[in-house]
Amino acid sequence: MNAETVALAVSRFKLSPNHKLKLVFNGAEYLYDDSIMIECNNTCMTLSSKLDDGKIHTLYIEYSFIQGVEVIEG
């Protein structure tokens, strides 16, 4: 499934505890757990999470950099 399809399907979601987001961008594979909030708009996917420092950190990824996205059990 390409990133644009995900963006059209949902605009904001959070994974259930038994699922992870597998995201491939810039040639590397990343695995995110249910602690992230995922938002999609017309140009990018946004991943937000509260880290150990207590602050919310946000990563904006333009769709053109995403090679694959998948929700997996685990």
Language model: regions and residue ranges:
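Short glycine-rich, low-complexity segments
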Residues: 1-29, 72
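Acidic, low-complexity, intrinsically disordered interaction modules
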Residues: 29-51
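Structured surface patches comprising rigid loops and adjacent beta-strands/short helices at the edges
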Residues: 35, 61-74
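Acidic, aromatic-enriched beta-alpha/helix-loop junctions
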Residues: 44-67
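Generic serine detector
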Residues: 11, 16, 35, 48-49, ...
